[in-house]
Curated annotation (Swiss-Prot):
Entry's Gene Ontology cellular component terms: cytoplasm
Complex formation: Monomer.
Organism: Rubrobacter xylanophilus (strain DSM 9941 / JCM 11954 / NBRC 16129 / PRD-1)
Active site: H15
Residues annotated as binding tRNA: Y10, F59, N61, N101
Protein name: Peptidyl-tRNA hydrolase
Record's function text: Hydrolyzes ribosome-free peptidyl-tRNAs (with 1 or more amino acids incorporated), which drop off the ribosome during protein synthesis, or as a result of ribosome stalling.
Main localization of the protein described in the UniProt heading: cytoplasm
Length: 172
């Protein structure tokens, strides 16, 4: 599942990092987008492993509504993260929402036992509005992380979460 807001207005914003990563995975693995329950979905095959790319058609704060019938242990949730420097990609299993309303909605639906691929967008400048920042256009460093975040999703699917964490969470 890639977190983001629907519509062109939000397509290139920091908060839509999750949607951008799913678009990259779709570009790599093909498939066809179809309308599913409260989401757009595409079935793809990654190294012989079937996966469903799911982009909620709801706004961020209601992202969990698209998860009817899914279990936490079957999910990889890709999302923007203010607490990581722009361009950083990290893999994590479990944890809280950390102030992210999309994650809060997902956790309220399925619990917190899912894998996360976190795309760093950095913090806004001192005194700047956080909402305006996350809904602002993604900068170059964060955009360049999108293919690496797609690599991280593929690594989770192919090698498992532990191996993906070892690979993507290593300090450079």
């Amino acid at each position: 599942m890639g977190l983001g807001n629907p519509g062109r207005r939000y397509a290139l914003t920091r908060h839509n990092a999750g949607h951008m990563v799913l678009d990259e995975l779709f570009r790599r693995h093909g498939g066809r987008w179809r309308r599913a329950r409260r989401a757009e979905a595409a079935e793809v095959s990654v190294e012989g492993r079937e996966a469903v790319l799911l982009k909620p058609a709801t706004f961020m704060n209601e992202s969990g509504e698209a998860l009817s019938g899914y279990r936490a242990e079957d999910l990889i949730v890709v999302h923007d993260d203010l607490d990581l420097p722009a361009g950083t990609v990290r893999v994590k299993v479990g944890g809280g929402a950390g102030g992210h309303n999309g994650l809060r909605s997902v956790i309220s639906r399925v619990g917190n036992g899912f894998v996360r691929v976190r795309v760093g967008i950095g913090r806004p400048p001192e005194g700047a509005d956080v909402t305006g920042y996350v809904l602002g256009r993604m900068d170059r460093a964060a955009r360049e992380a999108i293919p690496r975040a797609a690599d991280a999703v593929e690594a989770v699917l192919e090698e498992g979460p532990e191996a993906a964490m070892n690979r993507f969470n290593a300090r450079a």
